[in-house]
Structure formats: C-alpha cells, structure tokens
Amino acid sequence: MRLTISREKLQEALSAVAAAVPAKTTLPVLGNLLLETTDRGLRISGTDLDIGVSTEIPADVESPGGITVPAKKLLEIVRELPPAPVRLVASGEQRIALECGRSKFKLLGLPRDEFPSFPAVDFKTSWRIRSGDVQQLIGHTAFAVSTEESRPILNGVLWEIRENETRMVATNGHRLAKMEIPYSGSFKGEFIIPPKALEQVRRLFPADEELEIAKGENHLAFRSPFTSVYSRLIEGPYPNYDQVIPRDNNRVALIDKQSLQSALKRMAVVASDQTHRVKLSFNAALLRFSVATPDLGEGQDELAIRYEGDPIDIGFNGMYLLEILRYMPTEEVRFTFKEPERAATLEPENWQERAKYLCLVMPLRLVD
C-alpha cells in the first residue's frame, strides 16, 4: 500500500473512527484501525465488536493494499504533524511508514485479515431519514438510559418507526425522556440501540444529509456516501412505557427554566449525596425549595411561578430534574403532577417545533 493524503482530512477521519476503538481489550487487533485503499481513496475502520465505524477520504493511491495500525499512536502522531501532505507506505502486512515534511515515523501493525469483518447488512431493504431528525431524537433522549447492568434492556434507547411518526424513548425506571417527530416513509419497525452507537451517529453525520438505514440479523447500519456506523442491537421486549405516562395530572406549574435550574443547583449543595432529595412546595404563585440533610445542614429558596391547582409538597431527585432541564429547548417549562407519589411530567412550553417532547420523573418520598 502506497498513497499520499491531506493531513487535515486524515486527522479528521482518524478522530471520527477512533471513538469506536475500545480503551482496553483482550484482543490486540481491536486497538488498531484498519487502513485499506478503495477506488475513492482510503477507508479507515474501527470497532469494539458492538459498534463499528468506517469512513472514506480522498487520497492519491499509487498502489493498493491494507494494514491495521495502533489507533491511539497513529492519531497522536497525525495530530502533531505540520500542515503538509502525508505519505503512507506499508511494508508487508505489519509495518507502515509515515512521512510529512521532515517528520518520519514507522509503526508496527497487524495483518488486515485479523481485523473483524463488519456485520452483513443488506441495504436493498433500507429506508431513509433526514440525519437532522435522528440527531434531534438522540440528543433529547439518550441521556435518560440506565447505566446499571441489572436490566440490560434499559441500557438502550428504544427507536420506534410508525406510520406517521418516529420516536425515541429512554428510561432508567426513575426518569424517562420521549421525543417524536413526523415521519413520511413507508418503513415500520422498532429497535433498542446502545447510546454509544447513537452518539456516533449524532456526531458523524451532518444534519443536512439523508441517512440510509438497514437492519441485519442483529445489527442496525447507518450510512451516508462516505461514512458508515454499525451497531449491535439489544434484544428483548422494551417495557410498556406508555402506561406509566400520566394523562390526568391536574396540577400545572409554568416555570422559568433558568431560574428553576439556578435554584436547584443551590439546593444541590446541601442535598444528600445518595438521594439528592429536594422538597418542592407549590402554592398559588410561589414555589418553595427546601433541603434538610442530617450531619450537613439545610437550605431554603423561593421562586415566583404561575400555578394552577391545590397546594402540594412533593420530593424529587434534584439531579434528575437538572439533567432534564438541560435538554429542555424552551425558556419556560410546563411541570405537571397529581399526587406526591405519582409521576410528574416536564414539557417545553410554547415550543414552535414540529417535534413533541416529554420527560417524566418519579417523585421521592418525603421524610419529616
């Protein structure tokens, strides 16, 4: 393999693909990137066996070939090179030389036939969707997935594609995020996808591109003309999230998002490190915050709000509320609840978007 390539393009491609390379692995080749020539230039691929990413960049190819190269070291070298063309020459299957200006490096690699093949996915049955729509769904839901291994099904994001809409849902059993947007395609289905894979999709594909998506036996593949992302799917039935979303919450508060965030951050300073419990007391035009943590101290605050309903005291994990508010797209939020032990919802108020967004959070029991 012998080729010349732009340093900027090479660094951009390496940075894109290196995110799929595991930090630690018992299989040495997974710490490498696969470099191989194509009709269009150079293809760079990386995988951790659950997620695979590949991208193609233009290159002046003198002779074809391929090799795997240590991902971290190659990226570190290219990052420090001067702004000049980079020449790559592979000697056999396990050595590659790199030259840029007066800089010269040699790295030991592994044969490309040791690199795992990407899953077989037939794009003849693919469907298309705007990348920006997928990014919006991911960006507003993936934060809510569970990080505990006791319920693996909750470690993924549910993606539902229906007749007139597509939605993503994520939950850890204590909080939930759901977004749906109009969809005009003919494909219908649902998948549970690891958030790490969705983060690569959100990061790598420009919002104005159209994504082509196809399903393999147990994988989902996303591709544009030059980049592909493959993800292993999480198997099993997703919980019936719809039945836990309350329809009859009759207490409604409209609250300035930034003011609510600021008050919760102040309360978090003296809240318990275990429960992060904050007591919220809603009245006609006032929201009172209070925290009491044994062996630490107390805190109180007040906020002017618009409120409809009887007064209520209700406890929440303040960190869950702060995380939800971080993804709320409007300056004002609609906060609804019914009883101190029932689920509460947060939605953007006066959101002028075609998307619909709802977050749910379960309350905490208040203790005297």
Annotate each language-model stretch with its function:
Residues M1-D368:
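Structural preference for solvent-exposed beta-strand-turn elements
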